[in-house]
Regions:
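Non-transmembrane, aqueous-exposed alpha-helical and coiled segments at domain scale
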Residues: 1-324
């Protein structure tokens, strides 16, 4: 059975707690989109855990956790997160944690670009409230085909991978030097970084799509864990104040690598009052439009608010359920 858990506001709805409860009866928990811009908080007898990349099910010893195809993975952050929870007595091994070979690597320059661009925008008062963890830049380079996937770490000795690395680095050095006046990065340093990540994570990398498909066919209980909420969805959120991935439940099987499967259950999580991390309008402000008042002087934000009000939260909820 497949259950998808997603947020139907701006994130921070409490999905981590819900998934932790569902994981008690699950065999597998899968994150299918986003990166380490998530912040799922779970409190157990072992302490308080704030999980940015690891699925919430990692705290359950009999649950297998997967970072699937639709993810962008900051491997340095993941290494630190694994070390942190191991220090609290949580086991993380290739038997209970798997990385998709198709997941995108968040390269070292993605965080640098994100930080520099957010600083530049902040000087003009138009910053997006980015987490500065390189998520947008990792997804951008995914669609430009100018980054690596985790499976590429298996083939760093292959000439075609080395040529791709050199080509990527040349382009990034032009961007960083031309736009932000940064010192160029060297190819030997980049290759050494990739080799270091490969040494640590090769045992975890596999065809997770095949693994999940086989597990479902054998009757395993699976939970899909979304990051953020519908109002941060790249297509259905309040653009441009969105994340860079598809957060709704309908994308869950695609991002998980099992695109032919439909969730048996969809759990939409919300809380009684609205909060969000980052810049952009909150849904309650749309009430001002009904009273003829202008909640914000910026036309772009007004347009986004009107579009959101017209679409309606009900439409987003139908999208989550796959009935729209």
């Amino acid at each position: 059975m497949l259950t998808a858990v997603t947020g139907i506001k701006w994130g921070d709805e409490g999905k981590g707690r819900v998934i932790d409860l569902l994981a008690e009866r699950a065999d597998i928990v899968v994150r299918y989109q986003g990166g380490n811009n998530a912040g799922h908080t779970v409190v157990t007898k072992q302490g308080k855990f704030i999980l940015n990349l690891l699925p919430s099910g990692i705290l359950h010893p009999n649950v297998v956790c997967v970072l699937a195809d639709g993810m962008v993975v900051d491997l340095e952050h993941l290494s630190n997160e694994i070390a942190d929870i191991r220090g609290k007595g949580v086991s993380v091994t290739p038997q209970n944690f798997k990385l998709s070979a198709r997941a995108t690597i968040s390269m070292p320059w993605h965080r640098i670009q994100d930080d520099l661009e957010e600083e530049r925008l902040a000087q003009s008062g138009v910053a997006f409230g980015s987490t500065r963890r390189g998520i947008a830049y990792a997804y951008s380079d995914k669609y430009r085909k100018k980054t690596l996937r985790l499976g590429d770490l298996l083939h760093l000795d292959e000439p075609y991978i080395q040529v791709r690395l050199k080509t990527m680095l040349e382009a990034k050095n032009l961007e960083l030097a031309g736009c932000y006046h940064q010192e160029p990065m060297s190819y030997p340093a980049l290759l050494a970084w990739c080799q270091k990540q490969a040494k640590e994570f090769l045992p975890y990398i596999c065809d997770t799509g095949n693994y999940l498909d086989t597990a479902l066919s054998s009757g395993k209980q699976m939970v899909l864990e979304a990051q953020l909420g519908a109002m941060r969805d790249i297509d259905y959120g309040i653009f441009p104040y969105t994340s860079s991935s598809t957060t709704i439940a309908a994308y869950g099987p695609i991002g998980a690598g099992i695109p032919g499967v439909q969730p048996d259950h969809v759990v939409g999580v919300l809380k009684a009052y609205s909060t969000c991390v980052g810049a952009g309008p909150l849904w309650p402000r749309t009430l001002c439009l009904k009273n003829g008042r202008n909640p914000c002087a910026r036309p772009a934000v007004n347009m986004a608010l009107q579009q959101a009000a017209h679409a309606g939260l009900g439409h987003l909820m139908r999208l989550q359920a796959g009935t729209a």
